[in-house]
């Protein structure tokens, strides 16, 4: 497979870390410039977008929402807030109806505050929380604001105390914390039983591939190219086209581009605070800029092939 800039959407297997996937891709594509768009815990499967080449510079401009399907086991509290952790306590769960359980979920819809798991990558005094936890240090984590755009009750196994959910949330949301807190809200306990990420950063599982798929194509003369072009991953961002060589030269030397402000005012959905992708007439991505509406300029923020 020919290496070029863009994104690979990996369907991660259980037991593999996000960094493991990055290392394998680096080796398979023989390139060092590879990075993932957000960590998936080793036990979590599913969608892991990986940036290749210059696409690594555009990760921050991807959509930040993520969607998961998972199962919560009531009655068990663990050290890691998932089933892999040490059991801390056990408690019975309430015998409530599907409708009643869904009403409890209202507390977890919209903007909420959650405390991350002790075993997480959150920084505490300059160190990852999981490192302190592994040393059995005593520490507290501050609540963090996250947004739950959608929380759907998929199934309620009252006999075994297992809840299946679908959740669409902002980046930085810990589903293990959701599982723990749902258990506490029900005057019980809870931990995450299993989890699959079905979409992340604008990519979904329908476009995902296994790393083994790349391995099979390696060395073939007419191998499949699974890399999604960076410009395709930025389809949610407004576009401005540089129409002549003078404008392109200005852009590539880091100078602002004069624009007709009405070009953007015609778009009702345009937000002046959001980034703009800049391209040429051949649909080649040139970078990212921001509009200065007072001066009617696009100011370069990220420039590809800078001079």
Swiss-Prot record:
One of its GO terms (molecular function) is RNA binding. The keyword Ion transport does not apply. The active site is at residue 41. Keywords: Isomerase, tRNA processing. It catalyses: uridine(55) in tRNA = pseudouridine(55) in tRNA. PANTHER family: PSEUDOURIDYLATE SYNTHASE TRUB1, TRNA-PSEUDOURIDINE SYNTHASE. NCBIfam families: TruB (TIGR00431). This is tRNA pseudouridine synthase B. It comes from Prochlorococcus marinus (strain AS9601).
């Amino acid at each position: 497979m020919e290496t070029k800039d863009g994104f690979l959407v990996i369907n991660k297997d259980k037991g593999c870390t996000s960094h493991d996937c990055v290392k394998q891709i680096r080796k398979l594509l023989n390139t060092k410039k590879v990075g993932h768009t957000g960590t998936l815990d080793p036990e979590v499967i599913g969608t892991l977008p990986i940036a290749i080449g210059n696409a690594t510079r555009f990760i921050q401009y991807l959509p930040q929402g993520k969607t998961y399907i998972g199962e919560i086991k009531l009655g068990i509290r663990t050290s890691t807030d998932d089933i892999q952790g040490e059991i801390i306590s056990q408690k019975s769960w309430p015998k409530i109806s599907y409708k009643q359980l869904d009403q409890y979920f209202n507390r977890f819809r919209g903007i909420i505050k959650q405390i991350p798991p002790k075993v997480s990558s959150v920084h505490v005094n300059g160190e990852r929380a999981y490192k302190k936890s592994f040393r059995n240090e005593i520490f507290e984590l501050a609540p963090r604001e996250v947004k739950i755009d959608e929380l759907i009750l998929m199934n309620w196994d009252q006999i075994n105390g297992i809840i299946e959910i679908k959740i669409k949330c902002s980046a930085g949301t810990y589903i293990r914390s959701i599982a723990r807190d749902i258990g506490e809200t029900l005057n019980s306990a809870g931990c995450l039983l299993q989890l699959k990420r079905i979409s992340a950063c604008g990519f979904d599982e329908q476009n995902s591939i296994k790393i083994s798929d790349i391995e099979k194509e390696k060395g073939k003369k007419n191998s499949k190219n699974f890399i999604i072009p960076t410009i395709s991953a930025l389809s949610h961002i407004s576009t401005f086209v540089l129409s002549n060589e003078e404008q392109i030269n200005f852009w590539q030397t880091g100078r602002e581009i004069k624009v007709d402000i009405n070009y953007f005012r015609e778009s009702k959905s345009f937000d002046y605070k959001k980034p703009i992708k800049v391209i040429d007439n051949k649909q080649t991505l040139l970078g990212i800029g921001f509009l200065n509406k007072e001066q009617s300029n696009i100011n370069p923020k990220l420039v590809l092939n800078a001079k």
